[in-house]
Swiss-Prot record:
Transmembrane segments: none annotated. NCBIfam families: agaZ_gatZ (TIGR02810), PRK15458.1 (NF012002). Belongs to the GatZ/KbaZ family. KbaZ subfamily. One of its GO terms (cellular component) is plasma membrane. This is D-tagatose-1,6-bisphosphate aldolase subunit KbaZ. GO terms for biological process: carbohydrate metabolic process; D-tagatose 6-phosphate catabolic process; phosphoenolpyruvate-dependent sugar phosphotransferase system. Pathway: Carbohydrate metabolism; D-tagatose 6-phosphate degradation; D-glyceraldehyde 3-phosphate and glycerone phosphate from D-tagatose 6-phosphate: step 2/2.
Length: 431
C-alpha cells in the first residue's frame, strides 16, 4: 500500500508528517471525510473495527465486502478516486469471540482476516492481545505474537490468492484501556515503556520468522502503544510529551516503523501536532467525529423546535432517548450514577455510545424528517448563530450554505481539519 509506505518513509526522513484514520461507518461522517480529502487532494484512510464489521455482520450489519462496497460507492458518487482511498481493519483477531475457547475464537479470527483481505482492505491491525475463555489472564507476549503471526500468514495467502500479490501493511500491538474510550473515570494513564514496546516487537519478529514471514517485516509499519492519551465520559487526558520522550527515542531506532495512537479523540490541535512530531504518525479518530455529528443534530433539533409546532417536528431527541431506553445494551454497562447522570451521559458523553443507535430505523426516520423540515426554507441566520456559531461565520462569508446537511458536514469537518493540519509534512532540515 504505497500511500502508507511512502508516508512512513517521509516521516523517517524528518518530514514530521502523518496520516489520520477515520474510524466510523456513519454515512455522513464518511461523506464529510471524503469531501474533505477531495478538497485537499489527500489520501484518505477509513477503518472498520472488528466490532463494527465482521463475517457475520458486526453491529453495523455489514460484512467486510459490504463495507468496502459501501465506501467505494460513496467515494464514486463524490468523485473521489478509489486510488486515493485506503481501507483498514482495526483490532482484527479474536476480540469478538473472547467468550469462546482460544481454538474456536482463533478459527473465527482466521475467517475474519480472510474476509477483510479478500474484500480489499490493505491496512491490517493484528490484535490477539485479549484472553479467550480458556486462556490465562493476561496473555504473554509470545502467545499474542504467535497468534498474530498465524493471522498474518492467512492474510498473505489470501492476498496472493485474490490479487496475485500482497501489498498489505500491518499494525501490531494494542493499547490499554480497551478500544473506544475508557469505561471508568480516569485520572492518569501509564505510558507504554520502551522495554514493553521492544518486547512486543521482538516477540512478533520471532513469531513471524517461525511462520516464514521474515520478508514482510518492512511492511509492519506501525506499533500501537499508549502515549498517555485517553478520554472517559466527561474528561480528556491530554498528551504530555515529556512522559513519552523515551518512547519517541526508542522508535527512532527502527527504520520502517512509526507508532499508531488510538483514542486521540478530543485532544487539542497542539497535542495532535505534537503526537505526530513525536512519531505517533498514525492518529485514530472515531467517537469525536460522531460526537460532532451528534452536536450538529442536537443543534438542528433545537432550531426545529423554534421554527415548527411540536406536532410537526421530528422529535429526534425524544425518539433517540426512547430507543436508547428500550435497547440499553450499548450503554448500560458504561454509564453509571443516578437517573439524571445516566440521562446526561446518554446524550453528551465523550464516549458517544449514542453512535451505536443512529442506524435504528425509528431514529433514522426522525433524522430524515428533521432534515426535510429544515430544508424547505432557509434557516434564519440568527438561529444559525445561536445554535451553530462556528458555522455561522462561514455562512455569512458565503463559504457555506445554511442547509441542514451542509451544516452537519461542515461541523464534522471542523474536527477533520484539526487532524489534517496535525499530519502535514514539513521540509526536512537535511533535504
Amino acid at each position: 500500500m504505497k500511500h502508507l509506505i511512502e508516508m512512513v518513509e517521509s516521516h523517517k526522513q524528518g518530514a514530521e508528517n502523518g496520516i489520520y484514520a477515520v474510524c466510523s461507518a456513519h454515512p455522513l461522517v464518511l461523506e464529510a471525510a471524503i469531501r474533505f480529502a477531495r478538497t485537499h487532494n489527500a489520501a484518505l484512510l477509513i477503518e472498520a473495527t472488528s466490532n463494527q464489521v465482521d463475517q457475520f455482520g458486526g453491529y453495523t450489519g455489514m460484512t467486510p465486502a459490504d463495507f468496502c462496497g459501501f465506501v467505494h460507492q460513496l467515494a464514486d458518487s463524490l468523485n473521489f478516486p478509489r486510488s486515493m482511498l485506503i481501507l483498514g481493519g482495526d483490532h482484527l483477531g479474536p476480540n469478538r469471540w473472547q467468550h469462546l475457547t482460544a481454538d474456536d475464537a482463533m478459527e473465527n479470527a482466521q475467517t475474519l482476516i480472510k474476509s477483510y483481505v479478500a474484500a480489499g482492505f490493505k491496512k491490517i491491525h493484528l490484535d490477539c492481545s485479549m484472553s479467550c475463555e480458556d486462556d490465562p489472564i493476561p496473555l504473554t507476549d509470545e502467545i499474542v505474537a504467535t497468534r498474530a503471526a498465524r493471522l498474518a500468514k492467512i492474510a498473505e495467502e489470501t492476498s496472493d490468492a485474490c490479487f496475485g500479490e500482497s501489498d498489505l501493511v500491518y499494525i501490531i500491538g494494542t493499547e490499554v484501556p480497551v478500544p473506544g474510550g475508557a469505561h471508568e473515570t480516569l485520572s492518569e494513564l501509564v505510558v507504554t515503556t520502551p522495554d514493553a514496546a521492544r518486547a512486543t516487537l521482538e516477540a512478533h519478529r520471532h513469531a513471524f520468522e517461525q511462520q516464514g514471514l521474515s520478508a514482510i517485516w518492512p511492511r509492519i509499519i506501525g506499533l500501537v502503544v499508549q502515549p498517555g492519551v485517553e478520554f472517559d465520559h466527561t474528561n480528556v487526558i491530554d498528551y504530555q510529551p515529556e512522559k513519552a520522550a523515551a518512547l519517541r527515542a526508542m522508535v527512532e531506532g527502527y527504520d520502517t516503523l512509526v507508532f499508531e495512537a488510538h483514542s486521540t479523540d478530543y485532544q487539542t490541535p497542539q497535542a495532535l501536532r505534537q503526537l505526530v512530531k513525536d512519531h505517533f504518525a498514525i492518529l485514530k479518530v472515531g467517537p469525536a467525529l460522531t460526537f460532532a455529528l451528534r452536536e450538529a443534530l442536537f443543534s438542528l433539533a433545537a432550531v426545529e423546535e423554534e421554527l415548527l409546532p411540536m406536532k410537526a417536528g421530528s422529535g429526534l431527541r425524544h425518539v433517540l432517548e426512547n430507543v436508547m431506553l428500550d435497547r440499553p445494551e450499548y450503554w448500560q454497562s458504561h454509564y453509571h450514577g443516578d437517573g439524571n447522570a445516566r440521562r446526561l451521559a446518554r446524550g453528551y458523553s465523550y464516549s458517544d455510545r449514542v453512535r451505536y443507535y443512529w442506524p435504528d430505523s425509528q431514529i433514522d426516520d426522525a433524522f430524515e424528517r428533521l432534515v426535510r423540515n429544515l430544508a424547505d426554507d432557509p434557516i434564519p441566520l440568527p438561529l444559525v448563530s445561536q445554535y451553530l456559531p462556528l458555522q455561522y461565520s462561514k455562512v455569512r462569508e458565503g463559504a457555506l450554505k445554511a442547509t441542514p446537511r451542509e451544516l452537519i458536514i461542515d461541523h464534522i469537518q471542523d474536527i477533520l481539519r484539526q487532524y489534517h493540519d496535525a499530519c502535514q509534512r514539513v521540509t526536512p532540515h537535511n533535504a
